[in-house]
Amino acid sequence: MANVVENLGKLERRVTISLPKDVVQKEIDARIQKLAKNVRMPGFRPGKVPLKMVAQQYAGQVEAEVLSDKIGQEFFTISRSENLRVAGQPSFAPKQDAAQEGAYAFDATFEVYPEVKIGDLATAEVERSTTTIGDAEIDRTLDILRKQRVHFHARGEGGEHGDGGADTSAQNGDRVTVDFVGKIDGVAFQGGTAEDFVFVLGEGRMLPEFETAALGLKTGEAREFDLKFPDDYHGKDVAGKTAQFTVTMKKVEWPHLPAIDADFAKSLGIEDGDLTKMREEIKENLGREAKRRTQSIVKNQVMDALLKISELDVPKALIEQDQQRLVEMARQDLAQRGVPNAKDAPIPVEMFAEQAERRVKLGLVLAELVKANGLEAKPEQIRAEVDEFAKSYEDPKEVVRWYYSNQQRLAEMEAFVVESNVVDFVLGKAKVTDKEVSFEALASATAQA
């Protein structure tokens, strides 16, 4: 008998599954006989329990298992014979109005994959960021690297790097060690008192009033001042209140930045300390970073453009699956941060509804585009990307071996290559506008994405 697939909506379908009772019963009997060979009951040796007693004990459980297996098998057969592209898992329910003597009847309700219509790529608009790495970017990077290697010396005490100047008072950039006592209405509060507290002036770690009070103090000097905590201060007990502080300076240390010389170059991995080589290597590294960031920005632009010109209905089942996947990813992230009981964190799936719908929709569009235009990743493309990624490491060959030793890592790189193929394909047809941006702006844009 032909299977009738009912259309319940844009993507929702229903089909009736009929299972002859004699076929089901035959399978139930076979499983109970097999079960009886090993079942244990008080008063009987293993395998010697009467079949009737085994059936009385386990018939309901075995029947449910057989029906579940048979329904799944029959649904698979129907979906193949009817060329149904089932999205997600079907739901099965007994058919209440079925007048089929000698048969079990179930309704299988499910969704199918949608037809994806991708519009004219020539109408897509993409802004492609470009950047140039010059001396200014190299100098800025060197300045950051020097600050990362800063070391401090007590003001006023001579040494191989000097004494920091005649002024021994605390200045912006100095590392200071202080004691402080804070009170509100004459009463000390939690977190308001500390000894040998260390911070760097000007880094913004402390509230502005506190830093202002510490500025200009010399070792041994103290200052009293009022400090009003912001209304949104993380310490709720003191938020919005004014405290009276006394800060005592115990040590003032000035920052000494290392000179850009051969020793500095060697600390960056330039074995012979050649400064020209150092700058060339920094330029190469910045170039790779700029390429990675521009690729990320343009990829997002291409994906947005594809969504704008594509038409499709999104299966709810796939959205729900992805929502649950995002919840699990969020819990894993919490666990990695050390949050207790992260695996059971009450994260509502609703908060990921919009993100999941976009991810599923984009996945369907990309799959259609890749299939229609042969944009699958080729082995040589994957190897080229792995080699490029490995260049930034000390032992590139080891990184390549590390990638090819794990199928999951390799699959992630394959997905990256497919996305790159899609981006290149779309850029070759879309309206592309190039925009020159500074490396700093590029870094800021990708950080906010």
UniProtKB/Swiss-Prot annotation:
Pfam family membership, one = Trigger_N
Q: Which GO terms describe its molecular function?
A: peptidyl-prolyl cis-trans isomerase activity; protein folding chaperone; ribosome binding
**Alphabetically ordered keywords of this record:** Cell cycle, Cell division, Chaperone, Cytoplasm, Isomerase, Rotamase
* InterPro entries, A to Z: PPIase_dom_sf, PPIase_FKBP_dom, Trig_fac, Trigger_fac_C, Trigger_fac_C_sf, Trigger_fac_ribosome-bd_bac, Trigger_fac_ribosome-bd_sf, Trigger_fact/SurA_dom_sf
Q: Which GO terms describe its biological process?
A: 'de novo' cotranslational protein folding; cell division; chaperone-mediated protein folding; protein transport; protein unfolding
Annotated catalysed reactions: [protein]-peptidylproline (omega=180) = [protein]-peptidylproline (omega=0)
Per the UniProt entry, the Enzyme Commission number(s) are 5.2.1.8
Q: Which residues form the PPIase FKBP-type domain?
A: 173-258
Where is the protein localized?
Cytoplasm
Q: Does the keyword Cell cycle apply?
A: yes
GO CC annotations?
cytoplasm
Q: What is known of its domains?
A: Consists of 3 domains; the N-terminus binds the ribosome, the middle domain has PPIase activity, while the C-terminus has intrinsic chaperone activity on its own.
| UniProt similarity note | Belongs to the FKBP-type PPIase family. Tig subfamily.
Q: State the function annotated in the UniProt record.
A: Involved in protein export. Acts as a chaperone by maintaining the newly synthesized protein in an open conformation. Functions as a peptidyl-prolyl cis-trans isomerase.
The identity of this protein, by name, is Trigger factor
Name the species this protein comes from. Answer: Burkholderia thailandensis (strain ATCC 700388 / DSM 13276 / CCUG 48851 / CIP 106301 / E264)
Identify the gene encoding this protein.
Answer: tig
